[in-house]
Amino acid sequence: MIDRRTFIAASAAGLSAAPLAAQSALAVRVGFVPVIGASALFVLAGDGSAREAGLNLTLSKFDSGPNAIQAFASGTIDLLVIGVAPVAVARSRGFETTVISAAATGGSAFAAGPALAKAFADNGNDPAKAFAAFRAAQGRKAKLGTLPPGAVPTVALHHWLWKVGKVDRADVEIANMGIEVVQQAMLASAIDGGTLLEPSVTLVIERDPRIKRIVNSPGMFPNIPGVVVAASGAFLKSQAPAAERFVGLFRRATEIVAKDPAKAAPHVLAALGGGLVAEATIARALASPAISYVNDPKEIRAATEALLAYQVELGDFATAPSTEGLFDQALYERAVKSAGR
């Protein structure tokens, strides 16, 4: 059963004031995972620009990639804002979909609890030395929390530990858990460190200043693709102009997120905050060094291939899904041209 929460991205007041063209807007079903890299979606849905452009967006939140892909493949979602790897895998299994825009690279960071943070501080932030020192001092491995296998933050963690930091595997223990569970475990000191997605990493450090940000995504796996916009083959065949319009709006919204986080924050808070996060915290998370905002698919192509290749090494799949035809560069460029850029 798909675990999702659906809401319409327009208020009743907005509907009553909408122009005639907007009232006959095309219904577009958009799925998303609740991460900061999807923020442009929340802006274009929340500020009314989508409806003004003739798109009536219905947003569906998915708490995991597999559930989102299941809905996407079943035909109940037209567009999906999610990590690139699940899209590539779905395509390799016969589902017709392409990436029509990038959204962000990175988006996560590794944070350490008090004891592990001290080990890093005492050892010049050298991962191998820090984890070895922690084990010597505590008499046990450092327990690290991260998302399930295959998730981008999890891939980034493994790459940082084994490829960048050359950490001894005997010094760490990795526990896979959900997005919100990692945050809760850090605050409860149930784990010694973990990979946290924004805005969780900003929130956790604000709530417990003893927790320290050790390394951001760029230092874990350079240019690692965070989030993309994928369209179903059926939607592209029947509504290609709408897909192009969406990409143009998404690009405009991305500029707002990158250049004016305070302006974007209320819309992102409405989608991600759940009433428990301050708007200022969201604004700081949007400006986090853990994330970069990018829309042009060609800018993430090489990093996507590197990501998928490393996932084979991790055992996430036997062979890397092909990226041939994965990115619809032509549609993206038409959208940019139509938007007058």
What is each of the regions a protein language model found here?
Residues K237-A318:
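Secondary-structure end/capping motifs
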Residues V181-A271:
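Pocket-lining segment of extracytoplasmic ligand-binding domains
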Residues A40-L44, S60-T98, S108-A112, A132-A133, ...:
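Pocket-flanking alpha-helical
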Residues T6-A22:
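N-terminal export signals
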Residues V43-A45, A109-F120, P225-P241:
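A bilobed periplasmic-binding-protein/Venus flytrap-type ligand-binding module shared by bacterial periplasmic
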Residues A27-G46, G65:
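Extracytoplasmic "Venus flytrap"
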Residues A103-A175, E180, G233:
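A conserved helix-loop-strand patch within extracytoplasmic ligand-binding domains
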Residues S24-V35, L55-S60, A142-G145, I174-A175:
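Short, well-ordered beta-strand elements
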